[in-house]
């Protein structure tokens, strides 16, 4: 697992001449559901204004940008790892796996993959090994990573809304599966089901009672 913190001048020059995929994740901390990642290759000829870290945008703005990214991006793909995979691999390795799935699902082969954070897995696409860099706070610095953060965030939030409709007693639409007081009270009263991450301490403690 490679760790990169700076880009060379040659890397930066590559941005304007080659396809670059931005990758980000959402959902490492929640107690329930998949960890969701996205890979996005933007079209330099169709700029998208207002891209930023998805957490710094309002829900309304994220939704609008989600639609614009889907329309204008050269390629994007969502990758995920299930609660069972998270329990088997741990959340870090499951997140890396989900990122690899997002990149491998792109319809175009990027010359470079830029990942938000301080770690990057090894990426391949159609049998080719890809160069990659991780960039701390990249979701606020690199447009393609910002776009990936928005795609991943909106996708997972919609999935939590759907889970809320199926299990309204848990309040997923509000806390999105994160370990809030209201969520702890809900699982204490109603228990957990198969979408919960059984290796996470609060869930594991409940199951061991």
From Swiss-Prot:
GO terms for biological process: DNA replication, removal of RNA primer; mismatch repair. InterPro entries: RNase_HII (IPR022898), RNase_HII/HIII (IPR001352), RNase_HII/HIII_dom (IPR024567), RNaseH-like_sf (IPR012337), RNaseH_sf (IPR036397). Signal peptide: none annotated. Its main location: cytoplasm. It comes from the Bacteria. Its EC number is 3.1.26.4. One of its GO terms (cellular component) is ribonuclease H2 complex. It is an enzyme of class 3 (hydrolase). Belongs to the RNase HII family. HAMAP family: RNase_HII_B. This is Ribonuclease HII.
């Amino acid at each position: 697992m490679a760790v990169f913190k700076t880009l060379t001048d040659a890397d930066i020059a590559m941005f304007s001449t080659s396809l670059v995929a931005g990758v980000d994740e959402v959902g490492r901390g929640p107690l329930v559901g998949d960890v969701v990642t996205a890979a996005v290759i933007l079209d330099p000829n169709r700029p998208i204004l207002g891209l930023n870290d998805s957490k710094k945008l309002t829900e309304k703005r994220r939704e609008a940008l989600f639609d614009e990214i889907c329309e204008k991006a050269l390629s994007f793909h969502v990758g995920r790892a299930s609660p069972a995979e998270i329990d088997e691999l741990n959340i870090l390795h499951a997140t890396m796996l989900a990122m690899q799935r997002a990149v491998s699902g792109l319809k175009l082969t990027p010359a470079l993959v830029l990942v938000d954070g301080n770690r990057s897995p090894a990426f391949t696409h159609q049998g080719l090994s890809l160069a990659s860099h991780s960039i701390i706070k990249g979701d606020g610095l690199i447009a393609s990573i910002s776009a990936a953060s928005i795609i991943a965030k909106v996708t997972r939030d919609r999935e939590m809304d759907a889970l809320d409709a199926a299990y309204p007693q848990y309040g997923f639409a509000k806390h999105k599966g994160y370990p809030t007081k209201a969520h702890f009270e809900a699982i204490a009263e109603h228990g957990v089901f198969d979408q919960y991450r059984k290796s996470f301490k609060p869930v594991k403690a409940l199951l061991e009672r």
